UniProtKB/Swiss-Prot annotation:
Changing residue 172 to A: Decreases expression of genes responsive to acidic pH at neutral but not low pH. Decreases expression of genes responsive to acidic pH and at low pH, lowers survival in macrophages, and decreases fitness in mouse. The modification 4-aspartylphosphate is found at residue 739. The lineage of its organism: Bacteria, Pseudomonadati, Pseudomonadota, Gammaproteobacteria, Enterobacterales. Its EC number is 2.7.13.3. ATP binds at residues 405, 549. This is Sensor histidine kinase SsrA. Changing residue 405 to Q: Leads to abnormal regulation of virulence gene expression. No effect on level of biofilm formation. One of its GO terms (cellular component) is plasma membrane. The gene is ssrA. Changing residue 140 to A: Decreases expression of genes responsive to acidic pH and at low pH, lowers survival in macrophages, and decreases fitness in mouse. The chain crosses the membrane at residues 20-40, 292-312. Disruption phenotype: Abnormal expression of genes encoding virulence proteins. Decreases expression of genes responsive to acidic pH and when growing intracellularly. Increases expression of invasion protein invF following invasion of macrophages. Abolishes replication within macrophages. Decreases fitness in the spleen and liver of mouse. Double knockout with ssrB leads to impaired replication in mouse and pig macrophages and decreases virulence in mouse and pig. No effect on level of biofilm formation. Does not affect the production of reactive oxygen species (ROS) in infected pigs. Changing residue 98 to A: Decreases expression of genes responsive to acidic pH at neutral but not at low pH.
């Protein structure tokens, strides 16, 4: 985190970045200088040590050479003086300090020459000094004459003085040097000898301890060793074995050279030809250099700190503070007026920057003032343009609403008149003309709906109305729209609902049906042979609708544009070109998507994918039915096992291949043993309601009024809201159908006044809005203001019958007594005297009640079974029992538990009705 903060700081601050770079550079230079100084010091120190060692070694060599040369000179002088001596008398020497010894054990008496040599040494003037110990004369008979009387007389002691102790040949210039020998109590000695023509050796012994001691005096951390002519260590050279091994493995020469860990100086001495080798350890050299560096570091480090501190202070004072002042002023100008200026009292680059920035601010101030004036002018122009656009958009919305109202009002009259006409006795030709007129009216209505929906989607005023929707009836309604055109083209139709597809789910049923109708309509339009298939399947939490056809297909280059508004792949085809555009937009609004796959000459498949939010999982119907093989797969998805049909039955109807809702209802009736009871008029409700119709359009009042009368209802007409409010004080109504767009007081305001009217006989009755507007905002506004339901014009008999039934259930729930339908109009099945039919009806109802009782005992859901029982009783005209079942159904919906005693009581009432038809 600290490194990240440092990185951010370095990236955002120039001064800190410069300071950091300077410090880093200074430290690097300082380190380089320290390392360079250390290297130079090491080189210089090495050179100084080499020079010191060279000087000291040279002095030691000179001293040693001088001693060895004096010894050689003494030996030579001894020989020379002996050769000049003639006769020496014993009395001439006093006292007697010389001795005669014989190396051989059998020869104890000196010869004449031996005695002569002894007397010569006695009388010679060679004095023993500090570095010469003894003088000897050794003849060819191994007789030794010694100058000192303290020399030992035993042979072992004299052995080093014999000829055998010297090399066969002179070391140099006729001088013979012996190997160094150690004498107890006397230390290390070496002898130098010279031979005359008779082979007599004249020797002088040299003391070595003082030379060895002096060779270690120059530097206390150097090592001095002595080597012979063969580079072998002399016996008095004591060094560690590791260094000894290194020296033995190196070819040494005079001068300086290196071995691992040491500097070496070798110098050859005169006389015996020995070499003095000085070893100086590298570690000592490095320690001396490190000591010097450590002595210098405090000073250099102090100088570094002082220098960097001074530079940082100067940088802060001369650069950082002015820059921060500049940044502060610049930041203030970003949000404050451009009146602030940078200080410009310096004569450097910062002053130039300040001057340029101030000049820029002056220019910006002028441009800003001009821009403000232009912005004010443009803002005013934009506001005026916005207001004009809003007024135009508002006029457009009003115009669309007016167009919708003006188009739907006559369409309502046309469609209502045709439906009323179809309820009258017509011959086959007249019925065909009526069907054609109705289909053309519905096609025209679909075109109007598409155009209005497209306009509302474009303007963003389109919203969805989500509610629980029954899937299978919706599919039947969509397939019903293409049944006629498909049969006229002799196209096969097929619907398949997959396993686990919910029968009830949460969606906008109107818009989903609109999408399917558009897709199916296009499939019929562009398919000449083959068939059309609607498939519904579930994948995880998605519901997938597939509409496939065997038409001519769409070219690949046209598929990407097929959802574009007003685009037509075939310019010769009919249509507005916005059906797929609306379907795609609606799918996206519903949280899904619409995709297309097409192969030219083979066909097209359009898939609609919608999310499953709230739904009821399907409950399988367990049983076995005799049905055509083509229905077995669909029945199996609902839990029904299919068997080949052995006789004529209702499942052989070809329409069941594409009307899956009818197939499901019929299969449920057959499994539950509910006969397919022939009802004379499926639309006729079992109740006669008091209905108030409020509409300012004469044609609407006339047509809708007649449609309500044809459904067996009592209708009261009101042409305005004021008239409706007056009637509310005179009569109680079960249902009020009211147009929401009326002059003076509109329908929504009328409902509000209706609820607030103190003299109203039933202020809480059900209101259903009648309107030519399909705008979702109008629907929401109606429900927000106390209107229960909303019907868009044109209305159909089926729609009116459905809302009459809803109003009847609403009133029964409020314990309002209703009038039963006129028995002469109802034509209930129970009116027949057919013993077999009535017996089957009783058996079916009895089995259905048994299923309900078993479900209650097992704690399972009974809402679907109760709904089926209510429909059966309604079809046979048992209004009293329908009321009883509706009460049970309402309590089930509220989550209350139904007691078995209530079902037993219902069974007794049914037995009382069918007591004359019970087969025992």
């Amino acid at each position: 985190m600290n490194l990240l903060n440092l990185k951010n700081t370095l990236q955002t601050s120039l001064v800190i970045r410069l300071t950091f770079l300077f410090l880093l550079t200074t430290i690097i230079i300082w380190l380089l200088s320290v390392l360079t100084a250390a290297y130079i010091s090491m080189v210089q120190k090495r050179q100084h040590i080499i020079e010191d060692l060279s000087v000291l070694s040279e002095m030691n060599i000179v001293l040693s050479n001088q001693r060895f040369e004096e010894a050689e000179r003494d030996a030579k002088n001894l020989m020379y003086q002996c050769s000049l001596a003639t006769e020496i008398h014993h009395n001439d020497i006093f006292p007697e300090v010389s001795r005669h010894l014989s190396v051989g054990p059998s020869n104890c008496t000196p010869t004449l020459n031996g005695e002569k040599h002894r007397l010569f040494l006695q009388s010679s003037d060679i004095d023993e000094n500090s570095f010469r110990r003894d003088s000897f004369i050794l003849n060819h008979k191994n007789e030794i004459s010694l100058l000192s009387t303290d020399n030992p007389s035993d042979y072992s002691t004299l052995q080093p003085l014999t000829r055998k102790s010297f090399p066969l040949y002179p070391t140099h210039a006729g001088f013979y040097w012996s190997e160094p020998e150690y004498i107890n109590g006397k230390g290390w000695h070496a002898s130098v000898a010279v031979a005359d023509q008779q082979g007599v050796f004249f020797e002088v012994t040299v003391k070595l301890p003082d030379l060895i001691t002096k060779s270690h005096l120059p530097l206390d951390d150097s090592i001095r060793v002595w080597l012979d002519q063969n580079n072998h260590l002399l016996p008095f050279s004591y060094i560690p074995q590791k260094i000894r091994t290194q020296l033995e493995n190196v070819t040494l020469h005079d001068g300086w050279q290196q071995i691992p860990g040491f500097l070496i100086l070798r110098t050859t001495l005169h006389g015996p030809g020995w070499s003095l080798v000085t070893l100086y350890p590298y570690g000592n050299l490095h320690n001396r250099i490190l000591k010097i560096i450590l002595q210098q570091i405090p000073f250099t480090l102090t100088a570094l700190v002082l220098m960097t501190s001074a530079f940082c202070w100067l940088l802060h004072r001369s650069l950082a503070k002015p820059l921060w002042r500049f940044v502060d002023v610049i930041n203030k100008t970003a949000t404050a007026p451009l009146s602030t200026r940078l200080p410009a009292q310096r004569l450097d680059e910062l002053d130039s920057i300040a001057g340029a920035f101030n000049q820029l601010l002056d220019t910006l101030q002028v441009q800003y003032d001009n821009l403000e004036n232009k912005v004010a002018e443009r803002t005013q122009a934009l506001n005026e343009a916005k207001k004009r656009a809003e007024r135009a958009n508002k006029r457009k919305s009003i115009h669309l609403t007016v167009i919708s109202h003006e188009l739907r009002t006559p369409m309502n009259g046309v469609l209502g008149a045709i439906e009323l006409l179809q309820t009258t006795p017509l011959n086959i030709e007249q019925q065909g003309l009526a069907d054609t007129a109705r289909n053309c009216t519905l096609s025209l209505l679909a075109i109007i709906n598409n155009l209005l929906d497209f306009s509302r989607i474009e303007s963003g005023h389109f919203t969805l109305h989500m509610e629980e929707t029954a899937l299978l009836p919706l599919l039947d309604q969509a397939m019903q729209t293409i049944q006629g055109p498909a049969q006229s083209k002799k196209l096969s139709l097929r619907t398949f609902v997959g396993q686990h597809v919910p029968l009830y789910f949460h969606t906008d049923s109107i818009r989903l049906r609109q999408i399917l109708v558009n897709l199916l309509g296009n499939a019929v339009k562009f398919t000449e042979t083959g068939g059309i298939r609607l498939t519904v399947k579930r994948h995880e939490e998605q519901l997938i609708f597939l509409v496939s056809d065997s038409g001519k297909g769409i070219e690949i280059q046209q598929q990407s544009q097929i959802f574009t508004a007003f685009y037509q792949a075939d310019t010769n085809s009919q249509g507005t070109g916005i059906g797929l555009t609306i379907a795609s937009s609606l799918a996206k609004m519903m949280g899904g998507n619409l995709t297309l796959k097409s192969v030219p000459g083979v066909g097209t498949c359009v898939s609609l994918v919608l999310p499953l939010q709230e739904y009821q999982p399907p409950q399988p119907i367990k049983g076995t039915l005799s049905a055509p093989f083509c229905l077995h797969r669909q029945l199996a998805c609902w839990g029904i096992r299919g068997e080949p049909p052995h006789q004529q039955n209702a499942l052989l109807n070809a329409e069941l291949l594409y009307f899956s809702g009818k197939l499901y209802d019929l299969a449920q009736q057959l499994i539950l043993c509910t006969p397919n009871m022939p009802v004379i008029n499926n639309l006729l409700p079992p109740w006669q309601l008091q209905i108030l119709l409020v509409d300012d359009a004469d044609i609407n009042r006339d047509i809708i009024g007649k449609m309500l009368v044809s459904l067996g209802q009592h209708v009261t007409i009101a042409a305005s809201s004021n008239e409706a409010l007056t009637l509310s004080q005179q009569q109680r109504f079960d249902l009020v159908l009211i147009d929401i767009r009326m002059p003076e007081i509109d329908g929504i305001e009328c409902v509000r006044l209706w609820h607030d009217e103190p003299n109203n006989l039933d202020p809480d009755c059900m209101f259903v809005a009648l309107s030519a507007s399909v705008a979702t905002e109008d629907i929401h506004r109606c429900k927000k203001n106390g209107i229960h339901h909303y019907i868009t014009k044109p209305v159909t008999l089926a729609t009116l019958a459905r809302y009459i039934s809803i109003a009847a259930e609403y009133q029964l729930l409020r314990n309002i007594e209703l009038q039963e339908q006129d028995p002469s109009r109802c034509s209930a099945l129970l009116a027949t005297d057919d013993m077999v039919i009535n017996s089957k009806i009783f058996q079916s109802l009895d089995l259905l009640l048994a299923d309900i009782e078993n479900a209650v005992s097992a704690g399972e859901k009974i809402d679907q079974l109760i709904h089926t029982l209510k429909g059966c009783l309604g079809q046979i005209g048992q209004t009293e029992l329908v009321c009883y079942v509706i009460d049970i159904e309402n309590r089930v919906k509220m989550g209350k538990i139904i007691a078995l005693e209530e079902l037993t009581d219902l069974r007794q009432k049914i037995r009382m009705i069918f007591k004359n038809y019970t087969i025992t």
